[in-house]
Amino acid sequence: MKSIQIRTSEVARVAAKNIVINGSDTITAVAKSAELQALKASLMRGQIKTWLYKKVNGKIRQCTGTLFNSLVKSMTVGGHTPKKVFGQFAYIEIFSDGHCEWRSFREENFIGTIEN
């Protein structure tokens, strides 16, 4: 299996947002940002992962999702990922009953991954 490659410019960008918006210390901000980029790379390789993030209303949300290529293509209209807004992390959430929906959250609200 190929190693996961993380773009350092993305890590720095998200870490800076975490420091400014959430008042995080540098080490925590960089660690969360690197973990988010590793999560994205894993999801794009077809893995299904579970993670936590803070919703806009302050509640903590646990979700399970993927960015598996064929699933993304089947759920995309017009060739663009829904909610593709700078600063948002868009993903396909997989529910226990098998149905899937597009979701997104603010990058700076990422808490961490949960081992599956």
Language-model-derived ranges and their functions:
Residues 1-19:
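Eukaryotic low-complexity, non-globular regulatory regions
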Residues 22-39, 64-78:
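Charged, amphipathic alpha-helical segments
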Residues 29-31, 86, 96, 106-109:
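Acidic, Ser/Pro/Thr-rich low-complexity regulatory regions
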Residues 45-53:
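A short, Trp-centered hydrophobic/proline-enriched beta-strand micro-motif
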Residues 67-101:
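Acidic, aromatic-enriched beta-alpha/helix-loop junctions
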Residues 72, 98-116:
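Structured surface patches comprising rigid loops and adjacent beta-strands/short helices at the edges
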